[in-house]
Amino acid sequence: MDSQELKTLINYYCQERYFHHVLLVASEGIKRYGSDPVFRFYHAYGTLMEGKTQEALREFEAIKNKQDVSLCSLLALIYAHKMSPNPDREAILESDARVKEQRKGAGEKALYHAGLFLWHIGRHDKAREYIDRMIKISDGSKQGHVLKAWLDITRGKEPYTKKALKYFEEGLQDGNDTFALLGKAQCLEMRQNYSGALETVNQIIVNFPSFLPAFVKKMKLQLALQDWDQTVETAQRLLLQDSQNVEALRMQALYYVCREGDIEKASTKLENLGNTLDAMEPQNAQLFYNITLAFSRTCGRSQLILQKIQTLLERAFSLNPQQSEFATELGYQMILQGRVKEALKWYKTAMTLDETSVSALVGFIQCQLIEGQLQDADQQLEFLNEIQQSIGKSAELIYLHAVLAMKKNKRQEEVINLLNDVLDTHFSQLEGLPLGIQYFEKLNPDFLLEIVMEYLSFCPMQPASPGQPLCPLLRRCISVLETVVRTVPGLLQTVFLIAKVKYLSGDIEAAFNNLQHCLEHNPSYADAHLLLAQVYLSQEKVKLCSQSLELCLSYDFKVRDYPLYHLIKAQSQKKMGEIADAIKTLHMAMSLPGMKRIGASTKSKDRKTEVDTSHRLSIFLELIDVHRLNGEQHEATKVLQDAIHEFSGTSEEVRVTIANADLALAQGDIERALSILQNVTAEQPYFIEAREKMADIYLKHRKDKMLYITCFREIAERMANPRSFLLLGDAYMNILEPEEAIVAYEQALNQNPKDGTLASKMGKALIKTHNYSMAITYYEAALKTGQKNYLCYDLAELLLKLKWYDKAEKVLQHALAHEPVNELSALMEDGRCQVLLAKVYSKMEKLGDAITALQQARELQARVLKRVQMEQPDAVPAQKHLAAEICAEIAKHSVAQRDYEKAIKFYREALVHCETDNKIMLELARLYLAQDDPDSCLRQCALLLQSDQDNEAATMMMADLMFRKQDYEQAVFHLQQLLERKPDNYMTLSRLIDLLRRCGKLEDVPRFFSMAEKRNSRAKLEPGFQYCKGLYLWYTGEPNDALRHFNKARKDRDWGQNALYNMIEICLNPDNETVGGEVFENLDGDLGNSTEKQESVQLAVRTAEKLLKELKPQTVQGHVQLRIMENYCLMATKQKSNVEQALNTFTEIAASEKEHIPALLGMATAYMILKQTPRARNQLKRIAKMNWNAIDAEEFEKSWLLLADIYIQSAKYDMAEDLLKRCLRHNRSCCKAYEYMGYIMEKEQAYTDAALNYEMAWKYSNRTNPAVGYKLAFNYLKAKRYVDSIDICHQVLEAHPTYPKIRKDILDKARASLRP
């Protein structure tokens, strides 16, 4: 590290208050840069902050005359004297006078270091004075501006961060300044731009890999982005570089507590952390204290963890026994450990140290409440109430009021209102905080679980029936618990409570899943086994229920004292038909101390008694039922009478009435059952349940739909609320009367128009019945009554499906026509609407409007993502996915507009949101490939294949890239891998055939056809197979056979268009000649000008024209390609007027389409046919300067060959050879390139070399082109290879017996040369 890096490190440790670290780095600085007094100054400061005041004073005195640090040394002397137990007033006055004197003439560096020191000791305003003066005298020092920016952001005020960011950016203009980069990252983090901050930190790591605070910052930012895996990985990297890194060890311990719930590992890490603190910050009491806070609040009261952090707290208190907050925290620790008397002792100590400590007094009152000292606690709370205005609203204080109200048996509504207030106050302090250590401390899961437990004591103990609206208290509980479990998933108690709430809500599957999670992590969790038994029972899984009860008992014998345990056991025995055992079990439950009867006259308002009442009644009711099932009607009636007497006047009384009706029904007395239920009035708690029971009797026993509906109508009339109308609507749906159901749903909506879920449910129900017009009418009517955007979205989505684009556009514009919103849900809804609007515009072909809508959606989504991580963490993945979708759509539109740079930018942004989205990664890779950026494409494909090894498109792209790098083996390997997994993947096979052609290995193709046939016996009937066969035959010089196979694929939807294009090309150029070329024209002149040949060409052109009419392009580029082919047909006629017409079209396309290779080649070919060679050459030279791409590969090859032809005609053989070698680099099977090379060698009379090239041309034309055979035989003759010459002559004559001249010119001469 250089001097500047060491100073930045010191500044970082000063701000983090790691003073022993300051000492160590300063010592290193003195060792390396002894002449720099700044290191000596910070050595003295570190010494001072470790409590060695006299030693520090001596060190400051020794450097106070050093120019650069004189001012800060004097300020430090004043600070040190004031920290001393007996301050030297005279020395302070003397130093103060010298400060005032020196400040007047202080230089730039002196002012800077003074400002820096004042910032470190927390005197921001004074520091700003010094820095402003320093900036003024230095004419805008960047170093000064960077420090000023640090001052701005450590004040933590939003208006300052914008200005600070500008200063940091200015400070970075001359290079990478670690201090400025660290500040920029901090600034971006404060603005909740965690990704931007992370990028900045990565910049530090790249440029300064040994600067460990950057890794610490990276680790914390990754946690803020809620990426625990990356956080832990960075912590591990840190520990590899510094095994005693406090922050990394703390993060690892926190990970095991919060994320994994692995208490053993967390305990080990905490022990390591304690040892590290002893070694690295032995005097840092505040650090020992700070480290404990997050653990005590997230460990679920684990005694093992609490003991470890108690040791750290005691160490903090021993280092600074005057610190009241340390004693207060020790008191809190004792409460968590259940040691109330010791907690009281510590709280008293804290209040002795600081009489004004509110937190100590709050803890003290909590102890009084636990001990039942209600009067004393009440008095103390009254006192705190009086001073609450000055101390601000405190969730803990409101909670104590709620606990006191419960202890005093206050009304339920009063207690619940207090608990609601506790939650609102508690969560308000979390706003804007990123996920991190401070968030864990402030969230305080332990406190939240206490509140949830209090809520649950007011909730019904019986699970809700299906379709029953959720109890508001349960909804509140689930909201709190989900917040906790998202942040601290390792806290099993939270998961258990979620399971309990889900069970009570009637969501049995969710309850089961959460309990399974609990028991996987802690098999001995007795309460979880007990709740799981209830879950199994509700699912009719009786044997599993019994097993859970046995496990529960084996882990905790105390459950035998729970009435609930016996109740579940009896219910399971009843389900198994063990009625006598169930009766015994219930009688055992009745004898438990908790079941002692209390008459109506001795009712208690104590809520715990009420909770027990629910379980007690359940045992009575179960006993009634089992006696009935056992044929003991008299016993059942007797228990029922006992229950009526026992629970008369309680909230459970109506349950007894319903049980009485059930008993009558079981005895077959339907009339008595209905009569009993009829007596339940609307004023009684279980009125709805009673009427539902009546309705059930009418429908199942009387088969009377009219009376069934009458019950629900009565509920709606007597209790005209949304829930009642919802039940009525569901009842109508149950008897298949949807029109009446809709009326009921509308009444529910009229009373609760803001219930978007209800409104959406109704609309979607209409859609499911295919009643689209009614659904639209409903949505429109609902919107007129003031419904919000969620219904607009549903309506617009329906209109889009129905292709009513204009109406969809109007609906969405209406939804978005409002004042700017800040509510997170409203921002989310606006974002969704903008995305849907963009889809509508795309369908309407209003591309500009579509892009505008997407840009607005992107801006909205950026705002959502900044807030959603803290406000709705469970929504983060969906919102990131939407952000990625928006960026990807913008990128697609950019590609359509040929703005590739913009497209790349947005695809990359999409991947920031969804790093592993395969579709986006693939599109970006394709774009890189099209932009001729193979390295980026390769990286993207490699990343994609890491997550999806079988991705076909990525594998094919990798093959293309390997080919470009001339790594042919790898290219073929990638495609072979795909084909070995799926031999009948014809898309891959077609690409492999092309690649093997370019590799010069077409002889390897047939085995892949065999593989496909083995995989699929009907392969030969597949259009894809026929297409691939045609391709292979075309490439191996069998155009007629190729046409036959392409013809079999030409009607197929997937393969037809490509087959047609290939057939047209074969028709126009069956022998693969260089169209427009002149080199071989004269050699084959007598063949080319024959009448038979001309007639054949005309027939082929007519066939091509017919085939063109079958082409049905679906894209803009497809239509351009069709025009190109049409004009190649015109050129094929060789008629001047047709060629000129084609030339005009090609020119037009080339003018409108940037660098359109096929059009440019078309122009050059037309010029050649028109004998305007210079103009042709100019176009071909343009193409020769362009970068090769796979899409235009064939056109590139043809243009290079044509240009080589021109050069050969002009005897510019070197230039021609370069182009021909380029052809062969990209296509080793290019027989025309070999033929031209052979021709050049022949002209240069290098017959041996000519023969070698003609050999390759003969090989890759599959020995089917007699002209090539003739030339090869001729050059063998010239090279005196007579036998080889004779062999080739025989091969040519065998296939073409009348081929002219070869017998006379070559065969006879070769034979003559062999004769002695």
From Swiss-Prot:
In the record, the effect of T1103R is given as:
Found in a patient with Bardet-Biedl syndrome; probably acts as a disease modifier; the patient also carries two mutations in BBS6; hypomorphic variant in vitro
- Residues folding into a coiled coil are none
Q: What is the effect of changing W150R?
A: In NPHP12; with extra-renal features; functionally null mutation in vitro
State how changing P209L affects the protein, per the record: In NPHP12; also found in a patient with Bardet-Biedl syndrome carrying two variants in BBS4; hypomorphic variant in vitro
Query: What does the record say mutating R411G does?
Result: Found in a patient with Bardet-Biedl syndrome; probably acts as a disease modifier; the patient also carries a homozygous frameshift mutation in BBS7; hypomorphic variant in vitro
Q: Which GO terms describe its cellular component?
A: ciliary tip; cilium; cytoplasm; cytoskeleton; intraciliary transport particle A
Q: Quote the annotated effect of L1002V.
A: Found in a patient with Meckel-Gruber like syndrome; uncertain significance; also found in patients with Bardet-Bied syndrome; uncertain significance; also found in a patient with nephronophthisis with extra-renal features; uncertain significance; hypomorphic variant in vitro
* Impact noted for substituting M844V: Found in a patient with Meckel-Gruber syndrome; uncertain significance; functionally null mutation in vitro
Mutating A327S has which effect? Answer: Found in a patient with Meckel-Gruber syndrome also carrying a mutation in CC2D2A; uncertain significance; hypomorphic variant in vitro
User: Which terms does the record give in the GO molecular function aspect?
Assistant: chromatin binding
Where does this protein reside within or beyond the cell?
Cytoplasm, Cytoskeleton, Cilium axoneme
Q: Which UniProt keywords apply?
A: Cell projection, Ciliopathy, Cilium, Cytoplasm, Cytoskeleton, Disease variant, Intellectual disability, Joubert syndrome, Meckel syndrome, Nephronophthisis, Obesity, Repeat, TPR repeat
Pfam families named in the record = ARM_TT21, ARM_TT21_2nd, ARM_TT21_4th, ARM_TT21_5th, ARM_TT21_C, ARM_TT21_N, TPR_8
Tell me the PROSITE patterns matching this sequence.
TPR, TPR_REGION
Instruction: Write out the ranges of the repeats annotated as TPR.
Output: 108-141, 145-178, 180-211, 285-323, 324-357, 492-525, 563-596, 617-650, 722-755, 757-789, 791-822, 831-864, 884-917, 919-951, 952-985, 1023-1056, 1197-1230, 1232-1264, 1266-1299
GO terms of biological process kind = Bergmann glial cell differentiation; cerebellar Purkinje cell differentiation; cilium assembly; forebrain dorsal/ventral pattern formation; intraciliary retrograde transport; negative regulation of eating behavior; positive regulation of canonical Wnt signaling pathway; positive regulation of gene expression
Q: State whether keyword Repeat applies.
A: yes
Query: Effect of altering R939Q?
Result: Hypomorphic variant in vitro
Role, per record = Component of the IFT complex A (IFT-A), a complex required for retrograde ciliary transport and entry into cilia of G protein-coupled receptors (GPCRs). Essential for retrograde trafficking of IFT-1, IFT-B and GPCRs. Negatively modulates the SHH signal transduction.
Subunit structure of this chain's protein: Component of the IFT complex A (IFT-A) complex. IFT-A complex is divided into a core subcomplex composed of IFT122:IFT140:WDR19 which is associated with TULP3 and a peripheral subcomplex composed of IFT43:WDR35:TTC21B. Interacts directy with WDR35 and TTC21B. Interacts with TTC25.
- Return the similarity comment: Belongs to the TTC21 family.
Query: Which disease is the protein involved in?
Result: Ciliary dysfunction leads to a broad spectrum of disorders, collectively termed ciliopathies. Overlapping clinical features include retinal degeneration, renal cystic disease, skeletal abnormalities, fibrosis of various organ, and a complex range of anatomical and functional defects of the central and peripheral nervous system. The ciliopathy range of diseases includes Meckel-Gruber syndrome, Bardet-Biedl syndrome, Joubert syndrome, nephronophtisis, Senior-Loken syndrome, and Jeune asphyxiating thoracic dystrophy among others. TTC21B is causally associated with diverse ciliopathies.
- Can you say what this protein is called? Tetratricopeptide repeat protein 21B
